[in-house]
């Protein structure tokens, strides 16, 4: 937070609110919908949901690995790290925002992330991400790491998540 752990809203935030309203209105007038994902330096408050569809969960590195599982496979350490960050936000800090409105950088399967999964591990990783119930998944993928099987797995998991979102979102 700011001084004395207090947050405040400034002219900058009012400007963003005006922009959110304007672009949403312009799309509505064109008969189109719009997804607004609020990503930088935002307070994770449900108050923002009157203007945006999702809010970035800014409480961790883009990718990380749990330290307490040092003898476990990389996949398990990555899933546990991210689950720990969600637990910290939603349980320890008791953020009052439904998880489906949170956005995070995941899934990440790219060269810069230094992860390498078998097809089976990749599938498990994607299902763990999907089961968290977010409405927005940004796919951080390096196409050079993908093979035909991984592309099929990705398609299968995305379709499964869409088909089950009415359950997963809660």
Predicted regions and their residues:
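Short acidic catalytic loops
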Residues: 1-6
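Active-site-proximal substrate-binding groove within the catalytic cores of carbohydrate-active enzymes
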Residues: 12-170
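Generic detector of multi-pass transmembrane helix bundles and their immediately adjacent loops
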Residues: 7-11
């Amino acid at each position: 937070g700011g001084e004395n752990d207090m947050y405040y809203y400034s002219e900058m935030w009012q400007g963003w609110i005006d922009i959110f309203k304007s672009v949403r209105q312009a799309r509505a007038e064109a008969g189109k919908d719009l997804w607004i994902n609020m990503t930088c330096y935002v307070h994770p408050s449900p108050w923002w949901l009157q203007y945006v569809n999702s809010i970035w969960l800014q409480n961790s590195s883009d990718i990380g690995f749990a330290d307490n599982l040092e003898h476990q496979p990389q996949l398990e350490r990555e899933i546990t790290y991210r689950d720990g960050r969600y637990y910290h936000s939603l349980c320890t800090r008791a953020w009052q925002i439904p998880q489906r409105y949170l956005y995070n950088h995941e899934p990440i399967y790219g060269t810069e992330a230094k992860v390498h999964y078998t097809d089976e591990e990749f599938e498990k990783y994607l299902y763990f991400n999907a089961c968290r119930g977010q409405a927005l998944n940004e796919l951080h993928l390096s196409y050079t790491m993908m093979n035909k099987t991984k592309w099929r797995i990705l398609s299968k998991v995305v379709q499964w998540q869409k088909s089950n979102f009415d359950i997963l979102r809660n």
